[in-house]
């Protein structure tokens, strides 16, 4: 599976890493176009710079706070963002227009992202199966916590390594109207927040400045995988060999 990056479409794309101090397009909400849905300051819209061919690239602006993040949001705000994001992701999946739909978040200079303003990306792949290289073993491992049908594992067979934490909940709880499922969805959001805070503030002495957060539907579960990001190991780049520590 190979995605095609169109360099012409990337021309003029803002980049806080290479060109810091520029105007943030996500702060100027009055100028945003192609908005699909909004809920307060949470906005789902079509990505202006759709650089991948045969895809539909969309953005979820999480908050009006330019420097906000999962690690710093108040608990209720983080829960609301997760519910909104899951509903947007599932709407694209239910449309049936895509072979697969991916949702993920970049944070920090080593994450692969270009803008500081907090956002997630929801990308529909028209022809490719984004899960083709994944296996259930990538999401299992050492159990470290469980409550209210939510559990947390540390991968013993990571996708990339070195350290990948999985937060696992029953699929569909965020869309359910039942009080039990609502409690589970909140627990899911809270667990993700705890893991992200750990990755940024405690893991490796708090030296991580970047992370990725990936979402998957796997075998009746929704999984959030948190990865601290460092310079990528040559073992993975050249040989696809993951490492653990």
Residue spans for each PLM region:
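Active-site microenvironments that recognize anionic phosphate/pyrophosphate groups
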Residues: 1-115, 123-187, 195-245
